[in-house]
């Protein structure tokens, strides 16, 4: 298993058809998408956070999450992941679905500001975790609002920083 991970090769990605200017940025929740999917107050607050590192309120984070989710669903995403790059040179992710079972045979669609901003994944499967005590394996991922979210296949990738008990 470790050998397979170490010897893993990059996935070949086929370039889309047409001119790059026709598809450039279409799967990125950049400023143009933000302007379209966020109300003016939320858009201005997010730009202030991106440009000046101003903290977001819970209300604004909820509004950003709603707009980002709507954009992602309209672009074919059905899952989201907090995506980060550990010091191993690869990438790591924690996947979740926009729809969760409600316990009554249906589903709830949820993606709140709380889910966007911070997650508490079990880091025991990450390079810092496997041989640690459980409490030491805990890790946190926090959204990086200055890096735009993007879609790969059917997954919304939310750029994050990952922090673990051991660094």
Language-model region placement:
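ATP-dependent carboxylate/acyl-activation modules
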Residues: 137, 145-167
């Amino acid at each position: 298993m470790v050998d397979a991970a170490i010897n893993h090769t990059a996935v070949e990605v086929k370039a889309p058809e047409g001119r790059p200017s026709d598809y450039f940025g279409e799967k990125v929740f950049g400023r143009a998408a933000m302007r379209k999917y966020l109300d003016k107050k939320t858009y201005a607050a997010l730009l202030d956070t991106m440009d000046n590192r101003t903290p977001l309120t819970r209300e604004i984070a909820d509004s950003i999450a709603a707009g980002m989710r709507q954009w992602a669903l309209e672009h074919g995403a059905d899952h989201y992941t907090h995506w980060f790059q550990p010091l191993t040179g690869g990438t790591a992710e924690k996947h979740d679905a926009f729809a969760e079972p409600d316990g009554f045979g249906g589903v709830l669609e949820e993606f709140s500001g709380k889910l966007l901003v911070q997650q508490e994944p079990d880091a025991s499967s990450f390079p810092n975790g496997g041989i640690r005590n459980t409490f030491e394996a805990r890790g946190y991922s926090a959204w990086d609002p200055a890096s735009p979210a993007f879609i790969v296949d059917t997954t919304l990738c939310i750029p994050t920083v990952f922090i673990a008990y051991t660094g």
